[in-house]
Amino acid sequence: MQISKAQTRNSAKSGDINMKTNNPSSKLVKEFLRESNYIERVYDDVALEDAYKAWRYLVKKEELTLILILKTHGILMKRLWPEIAGRMRMEDVRVGSRICPSWQLVYGLLSEWVKKYGKANTEEDILNAHIEFERRHPFRDGNGRVGRLIFLWQLVKADLPVKIIKADWPDPNGEQARYYKLFGE
């Protein structure tokens, strides 16, 4: 699914945040990571610390690779769920009513994704990259949080405005609900 530029625009009304730096100590990065955790209903400080560690690792890198994605997932999930940290899923899963690609296809699909979107540098391409990453659902858990870390990294590397998606369940018209609609969920 291709997303138009109009759909990728962030409105000031919904809280645009323009980060023109990849400074890993940025207060705005921490807010992005906190909201990213909250979207998944992960509220503890350990998970936020690990998200920040994953960001500090990721932001130093210049090229998006399969190994980089796996290491980012490993850092993010090491204390939360060590058995799956840094490993692609080994079972079939569904997200809501959507059946994700078979686990046997995940490695190939993620490799193709890296080739197609690894150098994405426009708002439209970066949003499409994020949507396609989430649809591949390469991990047993942590997909949304890793996907949003990559999304943030690509926006910062491209010197584009960063939108913090507010976790606002159960509001059916809130930012989080609109965000999930991008994935057809």
What are these regions (language model features)?
Residues M1-E185:
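FIC/Doc superfamily catalytic core
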